Design a protein with these regions (language model features):
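Hydrophobic alpha-helical connector segments
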Residues: 62, 76-105, 155, 159-162, ...
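Alpha-helical DNA-contacting segments of helix-turn-helix folds
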Residues: 60-67
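Short hydrophobic/aromatic patch on the recognition helix
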Residues: 43-53
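Basic, helix-initiating cap at the start of DNA-binding domains
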Residues: 1-28, 33-41, 58
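Amphipathic C-terminal alpha-helical segment
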Residues: 98-102, 138, 142, 162-180, ...
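Amphipathic alpha-helical segments used for helix-helix packing
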Residues: 100-120, 172-175
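Amphipathic alpha-helical packing segments from all-alpha helical-bundle domains
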Residues: 69-73, 120-146, 156-160, 164, ...
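Short, hydrophobic secondary-structure boundary micro-motifs
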Residues: 108-110, 123, 151-153, 182
Length: 200
């Protein structure tokens, strides 16, 4: 059982361990990484890591949970004052790629390491990922009610299509040998998503 630590002075060390783990997982791969590697990168003893996390798997979960929560909170704040559902989706799309583009190690963990097994995918799909898709879905449903978006489309499917497009942009950015900024790709995705590819 993990020892409970008071909040006073503990959050900084926990954050340091998570940042170190993100670097280690991105560079070595999750399955090739050890808690000792994370401790070394965080400049703490192995036992210190176990004061905050039960296992390497819990560390990976914590990286996901924390970053998804931050993305969802930031997204909701970003669109709070907006009324146009199209602009809301544009802002969320930019934020999605901006966050990943600002931290390549985090992007590698999200796009590659979290997908290393079916078990991980099932667990993470049931967690913050579902809440993120729900945010997209609710914006699209808002647009359907205001007749901005087509009413004959399934909002849940549409939200997955949008996420999938952004997700592929992030994955391609990671594996590409070209040096370019990721965030502007959100505008390309949204142009196609909102206006389609047919010439009319």
């Amino acid at each position: 059982m993990v020892k409970k630590i008071s909040r006073n002075g503990s959050s900084g060390k926990r954050e340091s361990i998570l940042r170190a783990a993100t670097r280690v997982f991105a560079r070595n791969g999750y399955f090739n990484s050890k808690v000792a590697d994370i401790a070394r990168a965080a400049d703490v003893a192995d036992g210190t890591v176990y004061l905050y996390f039960k296992s390497k798997e819990e560390i990976l979960h914590s990286i996901f949970d924390q970053n998804m929560a931050e993305a969802i909170t930031s997204g909701r704040k970003l669109i709070k004052a907006l009324s146009d559902p199209r602009e809301k989706l544009r802002r969320i799309a930019r934020l999605h790629l901006e966050r990943l583009g600002a931290d390549r190690d985090l992007a590698v963990v999200f796009q590659v390491e979290l997908r290393g097994s079916t078990k991980f995918m099932e667990e993470f799909s049931a967690a913050g990922f579902a809440e993120y898709l729900d945010l997209l879905c609710k914006i699209f449903e808002e647009g359907q009610r205001s007749r901005v978006f087509r009413k004959d489309l399934n909002a849940k499917v549409v939200s997955k299509i949008l996420f999938g497009a952004l997700d592929e942009m992030a994955t391609n950015w990671i594996i590409s040998h070209r040096n370019y900024k990721l965030e502007p790709m959100a505008d390309v995705v949204m142009e196609v998503f909102l206006n389609g590819v047919s010439a009319e």
